[in-house]
Amino acid sequence: MRLLGKISVSTALGLAAAAVAQTAAAADPLKVGLVSFYSGPVSGPVGIPSRNGADIIIEAINNGALPAPYSGKGVGGRLIEPIYVDEAVEAVNEYRNLVQRQGVDAVIGYASSGSCVGIAPIAEELKKLTLFYYCGTTRTFEEGEKQYVFRTMNSQDVENIAAARYTLSVKPNLKTVAGMNQNYGWGQESWRDFIKSVQKLKPDVQVVSEQFPKLFAGQYGAEVTALARANADVIHSSFWGGDLDALILQAAPRGLLKKSTGVLTTGGTALNSLAKQIPDGTVIGVRGTGGALAPASKFNDWFRAAYQKKFGEEPNFPAYYMAQSVLALKAAGDKAAAASKSAPTADDIRKALPGLDFETPAGKVYMDRHKGHQAVTEMAYGTFKLVGGKPTLTNIKRYQPDCVVPPKGSKSLEWIEAGFPGAKCK
């Protein structure tokens, strides 16, 4: 894959152990704001699992109990002091409150792309280390370089390029496509990049319906009727959270996703809760390789076991991705401590993030795009099948970054429209 200036966290962690041991007792805590939807319809599938995932990792970091390759207590010796804030309540104002009144060292958060678009310039203005853990809009880094803002998972362009490739691999004779996406940046960009990718790969595919209900509308009777009449081979949807659940439930009585194959790019959050309503054959994404599509590893086994023990259920992919952001702090902080032989400041951590790679329960993350501020990981999709009453994913395909990630220096839409020059797909 395309990786320039990559710095291995395993090397840094070995050097950091002694420095961490020396600084752990005396270092001030690292105050971290952790923001997601902890109330409302998004809280169940996204916000609460995200918080739970962070809890598991923070507890292990503070106790020095993370699996290899990590070692030592804290972030370069600084224990994490979490402050949880609900994204549902005036996200921009609450961000300012975290920074200016509560004095956090860093902020991890934001599920909604709308939140991230609003907060990114404020983070730069206030010069506060901010890690976006879930929002996917490409605007964050394509509309100007950032110094203080990072994203520790893929952006939506990568998800939808991979979705297009997967869809055509399972439906090579695809003729017609419809879209059901929320009417704001995330939904508009997701549909744009998916359909442009599909049509670049198979130019004869026709769009027969495009539906853009407002975010968190909740009721989709008119849109479901329109999609049923269109009778497309495939319906693409980037709905997430409570909107995704509502769509699945309202589509079920009409058999919409049985007649037309659903391509649900965030469908992994509904696997367990709505398994009986999701038709076999539905294409399921997890926005990377978290949750049900996490690769086998000792780290993943540890995370799943710890999560199940504490919360009594399987971790879904939002739990993985907030955990991933916390691990980015740990990896960068330990690297900075190894270099300075002292507890890292937030600015030390910020400077250690570009070019870093680090291990997570969802696999390796490379801080490689947009001058090291945008993460790169592999992407995975699978096909839903209910087996013995249990949800399973079959025909799983994994896409390496060289196949689905735009090259450095290129904008995603331009790369798609040019026909993915330089892509290396197996």
Residue map of PLM features:
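Bacterial N-terminal signal peptides
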Residues: S8-A19
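Extracytoplasmic "Venus flytrap"
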Residues: G33-I57, V85-V89, A111, M180-E189, ...
